Structures are given as C-alpha cells and as structure tokens.
C-alpha cells in the first residue's frame, strides 16, 4: 500500500517542482526589458550611469557583463521595431529587425583592467538605429543585437 502511494506521489511532486521552476524563471522578453529598457530617462553623459544601471539591473552578479546597451524610448516604440525592416542577426538567424529611425541609447562598455567584483563601465550616450531579435506571441524583442548609425 505504501508503494502505491509513492508511485502516485512521486510524479505529482515532480510536476509541482517543474511548475514552480517555470514560474520563477524570467521570460526572454522580461530579461530584454530588464537588461535594455530605460524608458524613464534620457541618455546621460554622467560617467556613473552605466556603473549604477549595470549593478541595479543585476548584470554584475558573478561576473562583469562586458557590453550592454540601454534604450531610452517608450517600450511600445521598441516593441514596434519587430514589425519594421527585417535583417539578418549577427549569429545568422533571421528574426532580427532594424528600427526605421534613430533612438536614444546609452552604450556601456567594461573598461580595460576592470575585474569582478569591481565592474567599471564607460558610458556613451548615442542616437542610433537599433537591431533587435523578436519572437513569441505577442511578437516582442528578446535580444538586443546591435546599434547602427542612421545612414540618411
């Protein structure tokens, strides 16, 4: 009888653990927003912007993320890029899209000699067209691929 209960309870326990694991996992779309969206501010030449934001957005835990870009536009405008000019991603995938106009961004690059846990970044505000990879339903940005100068 005890064996019968174990046979029923073990798969149920595994199922519960799988569901709980999925609930706690950040979606790719949410990760994109955490790592790249800063709609509430404008690009800043403040030299500490990247140091503060990279730490605040959990990109300096366990290692220093070498490069990151923050976009200072409304989320809906960045989401709309998924329906603009289709381009090939750096990795060869075909789910990237380029914004039709320039956006305000801030590039953060790890400075030479900077090592974890003392991650130090160079802050570079720019106006560039952005390239993002999109997927899902709804179709939304899940990866920041690049920024390019506006050729117009």
From Swiss-Prot:
Residues carrying covalently attached carbohydrate according to the record: 46, 112
Single GO MF annotation: lyase activity
GO biological process, one term: defense response to Gram-positive bacterium
Pfam families: RnaseA
Alphabetical list of SMART domains matching this protein: RNAse_Pc (SM00092)
Active site, UniProt feature: 36, 143
Binding, substrate: 31, 34, 65-69, 90, 109
Sorted UniProt keywords: Disulfide bond, Endonuclease, Glycoprotein, Hydrolase, Lyase, Nuclease, Secreted, Signal
SUPFAM superfamilies: RNase A-like (SSF54076)
Keyword set includes Manganese: no
EC number of the protein: 4.6.1.18
Signal peptide: 1-24
Family as reported in the entry's similarity comment: Belongs to the pancreatic ribonuclease family.
Function text: Endonuclease that catalyzes the cleavage of RNA on the 3' side of pyrimidine nucleotides. Acts on single-stranded and double-stranded RNA.
Protein name as catalogued: Ribonuclease pancreatic
Taxon lineage: Eukaryota, Metazoa, Chordata, Craniata, Vertebrata
Annotated gene: RNASE1
């Amino acid at each position: 009888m005890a064996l019968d209960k174990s046979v029923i309870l073990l798969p149920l326990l595994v199922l519960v653990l799988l569901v709980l694991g999925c609930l706690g996992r950040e979606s790719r779309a949410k990760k994109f927003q955490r790592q790249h969206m800063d709609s509430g501010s404008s690009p800043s030449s403040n030299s500490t912007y990247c140091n503060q934001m990279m730490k605040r957005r959990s990109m300096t835990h366990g290692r220093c993320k070498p490069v990151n870009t923050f976009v200072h536009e409304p989320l809906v405008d960045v989401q709309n890029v998924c329906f603009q000019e289709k381009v090939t991603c750096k990795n060869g995938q075909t789910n990237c899209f380029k914004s039709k106009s320039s956006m305000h961004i801030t590039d953060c690059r790890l400075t030479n000699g900077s090592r974890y846990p003392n991650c130090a970044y160079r802050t570079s505000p720019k106006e560039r067209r952005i390239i993002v990879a999109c997927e899902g339903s709804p179709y939304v940005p899940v990866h920041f691929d690049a920024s390019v100068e506006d050729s117009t």
